[in-house]
């Protein structure tokens, strides 16, 4: 005899999409950069920019309205489920980056194709390698793996696209 299949309770995602604020995109994200790194980007040798996961960058890259919503609903299982499944995202998407030095004597505007967070662990580094052909973190990862280091640094990463403008030669 057939066993009746009970449908799983579906989280009313649409309801939370309406209730929950959406993280606002950042049209132009200002970042300080060493000139030699800017030149690597221009030559096409640097495809991803990394920034340490710090309070300063969290303040700029996480949407306060979404964070406040999540704080107000931290005991709501459906909201937490929607967050885990990626239907609610507090990280703001960056559309372009305005790189410059301290004195603003030069600038480099670059399209940002994607941005997210990562830890210095094999899975995350492999993602960056496979998707953006970036090997900047390979040595640091190998070192931590060799030392069997438990605590791993976290970063924000920005996948760089087309050059939008510059005054660098």
Identify the meaning behind each predicted range.
Residues 5-23, 27-169:
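Structured alpha/beta reader/binder surfaces that contact nucleic acids or chromatin modification marks
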């Amino acid at each position: 005899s057939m066993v009746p299949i009970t449908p799983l309770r579906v989280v009313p995602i649409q309801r939370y999409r309406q209730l929950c604020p959406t993280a606002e995109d950042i049209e132009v994200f200002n970042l300080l950069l060493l000139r030699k790194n800017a030149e690597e980007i221009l030559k096409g040798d640097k495809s991803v920019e990394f920034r340490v996961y710090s309070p300063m960058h969290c303040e700029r890259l996480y949407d306060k309205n979404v964070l406040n919503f999540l704080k107000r609903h931290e005991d709501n299982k459906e909201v937490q489920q929607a967050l885990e499944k990626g239907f609610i995202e507090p990280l703001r998407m960056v559309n372009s980056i305005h790189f410059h030095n301290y004195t603003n004597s030069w600038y480099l505007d670059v399209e940002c194709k994607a941005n997210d967070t990562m830890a210095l662990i094999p899975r995350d580094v492999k993602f960056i390698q496979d998707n953006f052909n970036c090997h900047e973190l390979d040595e640091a990862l190998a070192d931590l793996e060799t030392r069997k280091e438990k605590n791993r640094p976290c970063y924000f990463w920005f996948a760089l696209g087309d050059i939008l403008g510059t005054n660098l030669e």
